[in-house]
């Protein structure tokens, strides 16, 4: 649909509508053509709805969260991946798990210039972006669940997943599912998730506000809003956004580019997903080791040099255990 394969294993209103509109054509192709009929993973229908609303509202904005396009490239290439140019050019196939509206997949084509990049996401807003994305060199969008990706195991030179698996029913199960898509010999796996330590590391009143945000969002907003009808969810999101936007729009590096849509996007991400799990550093790093990777942690000090603020969350780029690891930041 709009150049985007929809490879979900469970039915949605989109696929039902497609079947109704094309019933005669489908029957001419084969009598066995039917809707996907499996049961979605726990919470997936809610996750799909809330993230479709989130990315459909922002669309192709010049900012992705707090980052402009140039900053997004620096973040992924220099802070998180830390690969040499030779390493990056050696990658021929890249899977971006949770591509949002597609901008992250475009960034990955710049980092991996020789690679065929597949941008997979369960949110249906990626379909709206389809025609634009397929015009980009080497970008290939697909709608799919990360638990049922329509690709062979061990098929990608690099799998990239930033801020996604902690929004599933089980971050650990999500990690295992995407790790199976990494090439067994020289494949790499990058993952970033919310860090449990963050809510305890900020001192003073600001630290209390961080702790309060997590407590309120997890105990009140997420359980209620993720299960509410869309119009109720949107009402509260816009109510909070109207109150917060006058404060947020004048903060940060890109305050001149910050729009109301950016505030709404941030509020939706903060309060509407059903799941937003936090994980400790040691727990997270252990997952890499269990699945056959040596993890290289993100560059926190370098992040502060570039962006002037503290890096949150925990990210690591995992190498297969028999590979020699030489992060590019260590080279002269």
Each model region followed by its residue ranges:
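A conserved beta-strand element that flanks and buttresses the S-adenosyl-L-methionine
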Residues: 160
């Amino acid at each position: 649909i709009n150049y985007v394969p929809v490879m979900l294993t469970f039915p949605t209103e989109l696929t039902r509508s497609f079947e109704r509109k094309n019933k005669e054509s489908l029957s001419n192709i084969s009598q066995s053509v039917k809707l996907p009929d499996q049961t979605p993973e726990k919470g997936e229908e809610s996750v799909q709805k809330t993230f479709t609303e989130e990315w459909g509202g922002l669309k192709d904005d010049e900012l992705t969260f707090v980052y402009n396009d140039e900053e997004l490239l620096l973040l992924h290439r220099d802070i998180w991946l830390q690969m040499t140019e030779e390493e990056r050019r050696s990658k021929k196939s890249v899977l971006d798990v949770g591509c949002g509206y597609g901008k992250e997949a475009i960034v990955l084509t710049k980092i991996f210039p020789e690679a065929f990049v597949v941008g997979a996401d369960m949110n249906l807003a990626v379909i709206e972006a389809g025609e634009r994305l397929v015009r980009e060199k080497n970008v290939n969008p697909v709608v799919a669940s990360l638990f049922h990706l329509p690709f062979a195991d061990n098929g990608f030179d690099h799998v990239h997943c930033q801020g996604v698996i902690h929004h599933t029913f089980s971050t650990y199960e999500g990690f295992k599912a995407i790790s199976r898509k990494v090439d067994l010999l020289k494949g790499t796996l990058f993952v970033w998730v919310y860090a449990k330590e963050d809510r305890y590391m900020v001192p003073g009143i600001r630290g209390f506000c961080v702790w309060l945000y997590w407590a309120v969002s997890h105990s009140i907003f997420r359980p209620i809003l993720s299960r509410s009808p869309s119009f109720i969810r949107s009402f509260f999101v816009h109510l909070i956004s109207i109150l917060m936007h006058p404060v947020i729009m004048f903060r940060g590096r890109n305050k001149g580019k910050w729009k109301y849509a950016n505030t709404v996007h941030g509020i939706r991400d903060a309060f509407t997903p059903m799941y937003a799990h936090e994980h400790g550093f040691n727990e997270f790093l252990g997952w890499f080791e269990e699945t056959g990777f040596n993890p290289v942690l993100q560059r926190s000090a370098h992040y502060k040099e570039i962006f002037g603020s503290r890096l949150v969350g925990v990210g690591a780029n995992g190498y297969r255990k028999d590979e020699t690891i030489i992060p590019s930041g260590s080279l002269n």
